[in-house]
């Protein structure tokens, strides 16, 4: 029935074979078809851009997005999985600009917006085939055929509906505001897009400028770190309650006003100036001054060039006086509140000075710093120049510095729905949970209005038409509405097409669309509605699949997709758009840096898959901290370790079963009796059923970390305890009931383990299942139900007993290893000490297991350590310090004098009284720290409630017995080297060695049974293989198959 398993296995090749099996037999499609009509489990797939190839950062969420839908499908749910593509926005435009070697609004418009958008359309799906191939090779099942694209007209129309709905609710407004702006992209960004980028430590010039007070020969010393904003200076700010000094500078022969606390920074010697007057900032509020540049003198009549008070002014740095220009949010707000000045912005779309600033016309603002400084020097207005190190935001798409500038933009009014957003967040199950109140919760608490317009070209146009005469606005929510108002047929909603659509206004003038396009995050946030063409299609069914049961993406999406989904879900329906979310962290290179193609600091992901297999990579990722939203320092060695320590041991367990099942012609049936008599069988079956229970509970809670931990723990139990301790049951020649029970139990364990592992490592489990399944079972492992526990087979008492024994064995083995006593060398006695009567009972019941595992002749179970150790004691200062005070030292000395008998009494619960002068102190066990000293020939270890001792004295008989085990190992190795089958009987040839003859004479039967040897013969001519016993005894052996 079973097919032979090759000893040398190439896992990537197996995976490719399985992939072909899935595709040829349409297994994914069948898994969907068999769940049609079942309860829906709604999953949203966050759309990636296809302008770049998938990398490790994509592999993490894609693995998670495969595990949960596979699991839910096996649990009987219908899980639609449609892939989506983010096709609009800055990333696409930036790629096209690079390929066309053009830059900025002017060059794009010169090239032609229609041609530019066509290029965007052509490039946007450049890597879709590579994405499909890579994601499929990772093992993810997802429907690429019925994908959605944000550039599809149906998708775009639904986004218009979302916009119009918010607009009609009064949640969208247009305003002039200071926003972070990307000069290279020539568009504003939202505040959360700024956080998607990087803040870098940069050096900027720090200037102290002399501003002359109007009609006086006195100067304000104002500070700035943005020299390029000085041409647009419209005011100066001081702190209302800050102390200022008017001083006379003896060297410069000039009078200055400066923050009093800052005098020491500018004047190291107070003899170089004289204080004329001191006052609060409030005292000079409203005073007029002369601007350093005269470009905008006309603004004086509107309130410019006056001193204002501001809360943000401090004396931590600078002069305590700052210059104000409309290129910062706080500056802008002061000018808006206290003046009627025009919001002058003499810079173009690429942030170059216009002809309004004639001295610096055409210069990029940051490049103008040095020329402005030189100009100030020539005018004798530069008081001091320094360098200022500070953190500055960079564009997340172009990696260039952002500029804060006033600009007209469209906003979603977040302030109006903030409390509802916080309420929506309460409905979400976050994995990890700390994100609810932490990163995401705090982001919502401090959320600001969302700038949703972009001064770009390739995007979903803002559907607002404005009357050229009256300024009246009409917001459009569908193609049909636009066609009705304009009288024109609409096929494509992109900017280059619909900007041509105008219509006359009843008031005179023409309705023309506002020029901006929507932030692509608005589109991805609209994905639940737009991917279904809601509300234009299946409107009545939509709320059956909204909100999503599950989504998964990276930590950065707490300020991206998760955020926009929550905003739009709350704004539209006053509920969250998703119920459960697993958030992964960043995948970094092994040195902790960001993965970079230019740095070549990571291996190509496909090379990793082709070397180690997708299963190993998937398991490596979901075992790591990255699924807990922590960072992962990726390494190929980590994937290699998973292959070595998990994938191969699973295969070895499977290979072991198949090898012996073929030999004994074992054939399973569907009516395996699971009520076994062998304690190992009972135990492993109980562990299987407990694992089923735990996995169903934990995966239902989206706790992948706990699920993986439990699976790996079981694999260890199966391989390193059940199979290892059951080997002889498979080796023996007779097919008795015990042997059949062993086969049935291992078969049951393996098949159920594969079913439980299937969502995590779909390739290996499929390969193994195909050989294990009976002819009447499902075609694929992934068409099966997820295993549910059989409660009556769970024996918690037995599991606890066996786990205690495994713990004892582990401690004892560690003790042997720490003293270099090989496990093959038998010892005479193991002592196990525990005061717990239940533990003593377990040890007594299972002592044969311990004797075998520890390779000991005898076991002695004790309730105290007297036979193993003598004691010394030290004072527990932490416990005694507060009680004893000044007598601490004296009591500590007395404790050190306690003899073994005194300490034993304390261990047994008695108090020991110590008298110091007129004081007596009762010392108990918690007051002392025990030191154990091993008795002669004993090696002792203590862990928790258990102390273990080994008698290390090796007699000649024990020595020879140990050598016999080494001989067995050498013979087994020789069998493997000669490619003997595990069932082959052999003749063992040995050379004429005295020690070897001693070993054979005492342990011949044991050696024969363990090596399937039917005859042992001294034959120097056939014993040709040299081997060492105990690293020092050189012998020769040889083997032949028994042919009689």
Curated annotation (Swiss-Prot):
Write out the residue ranges of the motif 'KMSKS' region: 594-598
Task: Please list the reactions this protein catalyses.
Answer: tRNA(Ile) + L-isoleucine + ATP = L-isoleucyl-tRNA(Ile) + AMP + diphosphate
Please give the cofactor(s) recorded in the UniProt entry for this protein: Zn(2+)
Name the InterPro entries on file. aa-tRNA-synth_Ia, Anticodon_Ile_ABEc, Ile-tRNA-ligase, Ile-tRNA-ligase_type2, M/V/L/I-tRNA-synth_anticd-bd, Rossmann-like_a/b/a_fold, tRNAsynth_Ia_anticodon-bd, Val/Leu/Ile-tRNA-synth_edit
Q: Where is this motif: 'HIGH' region?
A: 48-58
State the top-level EC class. ligase
* Main location class: cytoplasm
Any one cellular-component term (Gene Ontology): cytoplasm
Q: What's in the keyword line of the UniProt record?
A: Aminoacyl-tRNA synthetase, ATP-binding, Cytoplasm, Ligase, Metal-binding, Nucleotide-binding, Protein biosynthesis, Zinc
List the molecular function annotations (GO) for this entry. Answer: aminoacyl-tRNA deacylase activity; ATP binding; isoleucine-tRNA ligase activity; tRNA binding; zinc ion binding
Q: Which SUPFAM superfamilies match?
A: Anticodon-binding domain of a subclass of class I aminoacyl-tRNA synthetases, Nucleotidylyl transferase, ValRS/IleRS/LeuRS editing domain
Kindly list the places in or outside the cell where this protein is found, as annotated in its UniProt entry: Cytoplasm
Pfam families per UniProt: Anticodon_1, DUF5915, tRNA-synt_1
Chain residues that bind ATP:
597
Q: What is its EC number?
A: 6.1.1.5
Q: Which GO terms describe its biological process?
A: isoleucyl-tRNA aminoacylation
What this chain does, per the entry, is described as: Catalyzes the attachment of isoleucine to tRNA(Ile). As IleRS can inadvertently accommodate and process structurally similar amino acids such as valine, to avoid such errors it has two additional distinct tRNA(Ile)-dependent editing activities. One activity is designated as 'pretransfer' editing and involves the hydrolysis of activated Val-AMP. The other activity is designated 'posttransfer' editing and involves deacylation of mischarged Val-tRNA(Ile).
Write out the similarity annotation: Belongs to the class-I aminoacyl-tRNA synthetase family. IleS type 2 subfamily.
Record note on quaternary structure: Monomer.
The record's note on its domains: IleRS has two distinct active sites: one for aminoacylation and one for editing. The misactivated valine is translocated from the active site to the editing site, which sterically excludes the correctly activated isoleucine. The single editing site contains two valyl binding pockets, one specific for each substrate (Val-AMP or Val-tRNA(Ile)).
Q: What is this protein called?
A: Isoleucine--tRNA ligase
Gene source species: Borrelia hermsii (strain HS1 / DAH)
Question: Which gene codes for it?
Answer: ileS
């Amino acid at each position: 029935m079973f097919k032979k398993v090759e000893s040398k296995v190439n896992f990537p090749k197996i995976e490719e074979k399985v992939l072909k099996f899935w595709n040829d037999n349409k297994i994914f499609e069948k898994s969907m078809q068999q769940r049609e009509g079942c309860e829906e489990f709604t999953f949203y797939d966050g759309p990636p851009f296809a302008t770049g190839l998938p990398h490790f950062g994509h592999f993490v969420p894609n693995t998670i997005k495969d595990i949960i839908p596979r699991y839910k499908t096996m649990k009987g749910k219908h899980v639609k999985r449609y892939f989506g593509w983010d096709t609009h926005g800055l990333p696409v435009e930036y790629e096209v600009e690079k390929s066309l070697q053009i830059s900025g609004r002017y060059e794009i418009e010169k090239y032609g917006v229609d041609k530019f958008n066509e290029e965007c359309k052509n490039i946007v799906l450049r890597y879709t085939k590579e994405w499909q191939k890579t994601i499929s090779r990772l093992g993810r099942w997802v429907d690429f055929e019925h994908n959605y694209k944000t550039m599809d007209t149906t998708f775009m129309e639904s986004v218009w509906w979302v916009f119009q709905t918010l607009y009609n609710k009064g949640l969208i407004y247009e305003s002039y505001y200071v926003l972070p702006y990307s000069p290279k992209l020539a568009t504003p960004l939202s505040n959360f897009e700024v956080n998607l980028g990087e803040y870098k430590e940069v050096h900027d010039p720090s200037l102290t400028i002399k501003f002359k007070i109007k009609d006086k020969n006195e100067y304000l010393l104002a500070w700035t770190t943005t020299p390029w904003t000085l041409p647009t200076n419209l005011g100066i700010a001081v702190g209302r309650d800050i102390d200022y000094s008017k001083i006379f500078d003896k060297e410069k022969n000039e009078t200055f006003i400066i923050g009093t606390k800052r005098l020491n920074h500018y004047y190291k010697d107070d003899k170089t100036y004289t204080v004329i007057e001191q006052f609060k900032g409030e005292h000079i509020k409203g005073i007029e001054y002369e601007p350093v540049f005269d470009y905008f003198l006309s603004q004086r009549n509107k309130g410019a060039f006056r001193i204002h008070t501001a809360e943000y002014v401090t004396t931590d740095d600078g002069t305590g006086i700052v210059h104000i220009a409309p290129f910062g949010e706080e500056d802008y707000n002061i000018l808006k509140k206290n003046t009627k000045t025009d919001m002058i912005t003499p810079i173009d779309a690429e942030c170059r000075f216009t002809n309004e600033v004639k001295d610096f016309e055409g210069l990029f603002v940051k490049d103008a710093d040095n020329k402005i400084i030189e100009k100030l020097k020539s005018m004798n207005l530069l008081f001091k120049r320094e360098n200022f190190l500070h953190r500055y935001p960079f564009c997340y798409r172009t990696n260039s510095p952002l500029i804060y500038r006033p600009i007209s933009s469209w906003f979603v009014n977040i302030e109006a729905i903030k409390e509802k957003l916080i309420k929506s967040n309460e409905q979400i199950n976050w994995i990890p949970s700390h994100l609810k109140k932490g990163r995401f919760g705090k982001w919502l608490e401090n959320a600001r209005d969302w700038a949703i317009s972009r001064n770009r070209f390739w995007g979903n146009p803002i559907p607002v038409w404005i009357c050229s005469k009256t300024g009246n606005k009409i917001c459009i929510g569908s193609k049909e509405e636009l066609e009705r108002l304009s009288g024109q047929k609409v096929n494509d909603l992109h900017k280059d097409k619909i900007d041509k659509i105008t219509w006359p206004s009843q008031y005179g003038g023409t309705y023309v669309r506002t020029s901006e396009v929507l932030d692509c995050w608005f589109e991805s946030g609209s994905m639940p509605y737009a991917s279904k063409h809601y509300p234009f299609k299946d409107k009545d069914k939509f709320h059956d699949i909204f909100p999503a049961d599950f989504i998964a993406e990276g930590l950065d999406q707490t300020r991206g997709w998760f955020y926009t989904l929550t905003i739009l879900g709350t704004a539209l329906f006053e509920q969250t758009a998703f119920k459960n979310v697993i958030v992964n962290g960043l995948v970094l290179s092994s040195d902790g840096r960001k993965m970079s193609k230019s740095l070549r600091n990571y291996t190509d992901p496909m090379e990793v898959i082709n070397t180690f297999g997708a299963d190993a990579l998937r398991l490596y990722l979901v075992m790591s901290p990255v699924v807990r939203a922590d960072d992962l320092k990726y390494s190929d060695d980590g994937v290699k370790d998973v292959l070595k320590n998990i994938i191969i041991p699973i295969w070895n367990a499977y290979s072991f079963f198949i090898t012996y099942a073929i030999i004994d012609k074992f054939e399973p049936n569907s009516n395996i009796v699971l009520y076994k008599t062998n304690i190992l069988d009972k135990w492993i079956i109980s562990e299987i059923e407990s694992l089923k229970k735990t996995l169903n509970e934990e995966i239902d809670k989206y706790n992948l970390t706990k699920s993986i931990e439990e699976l790996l723990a079981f694999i260890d139990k199966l391989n390193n305890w059940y199979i290892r301790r059951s080997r002889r049951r498979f080796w023996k020649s007779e097919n008795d009931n015990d042997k059949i029970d062993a086969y049935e139990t291992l078969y049951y364990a393996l098949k159920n383990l594969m079913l439980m592992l299937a969502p995590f490592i779909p390739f290996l489990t499929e390969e193994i299942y195909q050989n294990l399944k009976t002819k009447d079972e499902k075609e694929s492992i992934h068409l099966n139900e997820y295993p549910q526990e059989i409660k009556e087979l769970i024996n918690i008492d037995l599991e606890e007993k066996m786990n205690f024994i495994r713990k004892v064995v582990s401690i004892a083995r560690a003790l042997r290893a720490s003293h270099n006593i090989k496990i093959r060398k038998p010892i005479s006695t193991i002592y196990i000490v525990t005061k717990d009567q239940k533990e003593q009972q377990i040890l007594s019941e299972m002592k044969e297991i311990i004797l075998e595992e520890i390779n000991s002749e005898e076991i002695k179970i004790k309730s105290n350590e007297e036979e193993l150790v003598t004691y010394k004691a030290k004072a527990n200062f932490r416990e005694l310090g507060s009680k004893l005070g000044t007598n601490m030292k004296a009591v500590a000395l007395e404790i050190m004098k306690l003899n073994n008998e005194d300490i034993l009494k304390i261990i047994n619960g008695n108090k020991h009284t110590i008298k110091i002068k007129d004081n007596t102190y009762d010392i108990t066990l918690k007051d002392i720290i025990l030191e154990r000293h091993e008795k002669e020939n004993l090696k002792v270890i203590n862990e928790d409630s258990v102390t273990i001792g080994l008698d290390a004295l090796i007699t000649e008989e024990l020595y020879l017995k140990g050598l016999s085990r080494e001989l067995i190992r050498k013979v087994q190795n020789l069998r493997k080297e000669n490619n003997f089958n595990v069932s082959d009987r052999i003749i063992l040839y040995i050379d004429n060695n005295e020690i070897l003859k001693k070993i054979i004479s005492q342990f011949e039967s044991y050696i024969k049974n363990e090596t399937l040897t039917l005859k042992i013969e001294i034959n120097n001519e056939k014993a040709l293989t040299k081997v060492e016993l105990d690293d020092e005894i050189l012998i020769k052996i040889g083997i032949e198959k028994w042919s009689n």
